Amino acid sequence: MNRATITSNKSNAPSFLSIPLLAHNNNINNNNNNINNNNNNNNINSNNNGTTTTTTTTTITTISYKNNISELITIIDKIIKDLNNFKSKTVLNDQEFSELNNTIQFTKTSLVNYIHYENENKINFNLSDSKIICSEIKIIEYGIESFIFSICKLYQDLIQFQQLLLKLSSPPTTITFNTTINSTNSFTSNLIINNLLKVDSILKQSIDQLLALFPPSSSSLNNENNNNNNNNYNPYELLSNEAKVLWNQFGGNKITFVPWSIFFKGFQKFFNKEILAYESSLRYTLDFTRDGYVTPFKLSVFIKWFGALPVSLGIFQDVINSKIFSGFISGIEATQLLSRQQVGYYLLRCSKTIVGAFAITFVDSTNHIRHCLLYPVTSSINGGLTLQKPPDIFKSILSFILSFSSKLKYPIGPLDNDLLPPLSIINNNPILILPDENNNNQNNNQNNNNNNINTFSTSPSSFFTIDSSNSSDTNKSPTKSRKSSFKNDKDKKEKEKEKGKDKEKEKERVSDENFDNLPTFLNSEDENDNNNNNNNNNNNNNNNNNNNNNNNNNNSSNNNNCNIKETHQTTSNGSSGNNNNNNNNNNNNNNNNNNNNSSSTTKRNNNNNGSDESKDLCTVCMDNEINTVFLECGHLSCCSLCSVKLKKCPICRSRITRVINIFKS
């Protein structure tokens, strides 16, 4: 039985992500031995000559044959057999097995396309020979040499995969802390599986790069005499015009692999900017196959993530500074990290399945963990990101998060030290920088454009309605609205007093609702739960002081509660407040009357005032129907055309910080 000592790992990310890259090692096996330096005594020991010894009866496959791709497929078949064995023994659950097996099967299917290319070009080399990759750090031209380099990288990834499966089959039993063997084995197995998922991600990216650099459909795979790069395809064409200018510094269309040190110098020269503080973050993001090189494929993916090359660096720095990017995390690991988090937590990661896409995993208002894909926009020169349905384009990932910040509130943030901001600003920058308040009109226009954004295809779509009974009087002309809102001086004084209290509370409050640009994702429920919790006392005071005109004052006395509701809402288990029995309007509005912050939602009211919807006209133009609500005052008084022109509410003269489009029921 193998024995190993388990020690705690201070980093959230597995240690193998920060090991020296291939081009900086003296032999291939160093990278494999450092995958789990917390389990250094586990089976495999490396010496200075690069030889490998094991203490188990099962050994890692080594290759010294001419048909290297066929041998890679042999390794893959053994891995597939092991995965099925682990699934049958419930070592891997269904999700973990599916994630790992899909990548391995995809790798096998892809490699089959290159057997003919290898045979026709008589490519003969030993994959286990470390001199192929690590003899020197140099620029690699497009052709046979770059193909061999790519195959060697896949070999390394598969060997890492095999090594972790070996460790998973024989977890250690010697421990250094007081716990049971079963719990220790479970802990160790989970750690190994997480590392497997990391290698799985790198393997998928390596095979994606091979397919991009040497597409199976190109003539380069069918030309018998293609010993050079004289073929109809060149990965140089993956680059935009601006990116080609950058790549020309390294040799133009003849070059495929550029060492990181050379690329980074050219990258700084292109932007005419010293960015040493961001080098580790850039290297983590650009060199996602962990081989120490940058290719046209990697640069093109970077542009898909962060926009056209001239603006990509600025967007990338903003993302790093905002501490929202978690990097290359699998969907399974993201779900695990969010499993005990509250509503509003999210994790921003790079998609493994869609090249150049972002994936956002978040906890929705029903405490379910959901996943969202943001696809790169390739049809636009400036790039951007888009949801699949409908295809609204966001300028950057930050624009998307700010647009839906009522749902994406608390980022998990970097899980690797390389993704942290520079030390000079790491403690000074907020989690997310809000847009300038002076750009109010621009934000309003953005809200109008994003009015019908749908999010996840797995969730039913819905739309917003507003409580018509609460808004019926405030939607009227200024004269009628003021007459109904202030029937006597006592009510007016009480309202001014409530406003004063609200302003004092707003100064002291540090709340995530300050990040909201849009009210919610359009497919979520119970959006106003948090707002109702913060405003319970205000609702109660308002109802007691204004029993005769409850509907008129509902919107105007809450801090940020616009009474925006969805079409399907249910009352939660929190206790409901006192209904105003003095109202003659059959008001069914439930108010919170507890002091322990139990939340409840409010059902939609029916407009029984006898007011006609045709009278709810914009207070500015008096032509269009009211369809916007002002924040922070909560008044509904303008149409969408007039609201973008205003800086102060025409009802209460309060400053307008945001405008939200609504739909009446």
Curated annotation (Swiss-Prot):
A GO cellular component annotation in the UniProt record? cytosol
- By what name is this protein known? E3 ubiquitin-protein ligase cblA
> RING-type zinc fingers: which residues?
618-653
Coiled-coil parts of chain: 479-544
Listed Basic and acidic residues bias regions: 486-512
Can you name the source organism? Dictyostelium discoideum (Social amoeba)
Reported EC number(s) for this entry are: 2.3.2.27
Main localisation: cytoplasm
Q: Binding of Ca(2+): at which residues? A: 287, 289, 291, 293
Where is the Cbl-PTB domain positioned along the sequence?
109-400
Region (Disordered) spans which residues? 30-50, 437-456, 467-609
Instruction: Note the InterPro entries from the entry.
Output: Adaptor_Cbl_EF_hand-like, Cbl_PTB, EF-hand-dom_pair, SH2, SH2_dom_sf, Znf_RING, Znf_RING/FYVE/PHD
PROSITE patterns in the record: CBL_PTB (PS51506), ZF_RING_2 (PS50089)
**Catalytic activity, as annotated:** S-ubiquitinyl-[E2 ubiquitin-conjugating enzyme]-L-cysteine + [acceptor protein]-L-lysine = [E2 ubiquitin-conjugating enzyme]-L-cysteine + N(6)-ubiquitinyl-[acceptor protein]-L-lysine
* Biological pathway: Protein modification; protein ubiquitination
- Residues of the region (EF-hand-like) are 232-306
**Low complexity compositional bias, start-end:** 467-478, 530-561, 571-609
**Annotated stretches, region: 4H:** 109-231
According to the record, the residues making up region (SH2-like) are 307-400
Q: Which GO terms describe its molecular function?
A: calcium ion binding; phosphotyrosine residue binding; transferase activity; zinc ion binding
- Lineage, top-rank taxon, reads Eukaryota
**Which Pfam families does the annotation name?**
Cbl_N2, SH2, zf-C3HC4_3
